[in-house]
Amino acid sequence: MKLTCVLIIAVLFLTACQLTTGEQKDHALRSTDKNSKLTRQCTPVGGYCSRHHHCCSNHCIKSIGRCVAH
């Protein structure tokens, strides 16, 4: 139990050290990449929808997998 706690604390400490001393050479590029991952495109009415493809109208009939107008 003590060994497990020591290992967890050591890993957390080393991770924190990496985060604080790591260089960010392409800060603007990373920010743009993060923003593009956060931007979601929606599927128009009549298009395919699922758990990962979202409708612009926010109405998906999952039994047929199609976006519908509300």
Swiss-Prot record:
Lineage of producing organism: Eukaryota, Metazoa, Spiralia, Lophotrochozoa, Mollusca
Source organism: Conus arenatus (Sand-dusted cone)
Pyrrolidone carboxylic acid found at: 41
Paired cysteines (S-S): 42-56, 49-60, 55-67
Pfam families noted in UniProt: Conotoxin
GO molecular function: ion channel inhibitor activity; toxin activity
Known tissue expression: Expressed by the venom duct.
Presence of keyword Kinase: no
Keywords, alphabetical: Disulfide bond, Knottin, Neurotoxin, Pyrrolidone carboxylic acid, Secreted, Signal, Toxin
Comment, domains: The presence of a 'disulfide through disulfide knot' structurally defines this protein as a knottin. The cysteine framework is VI/VII (C-C-CC-C-C).
Signal peptide: 1-22
Gene Ontology annotations for the cellular component aspect, listed alphabetically: extracellular region
Family annotation (InterPro entries): Conotoxin
Propeptide: 23-40
Subcellular location: Secreted
Family from the record: Belongs to the conotoxin O1 superfamily.
Descriptive protein name: Conotoxin ArMKLT2-0111
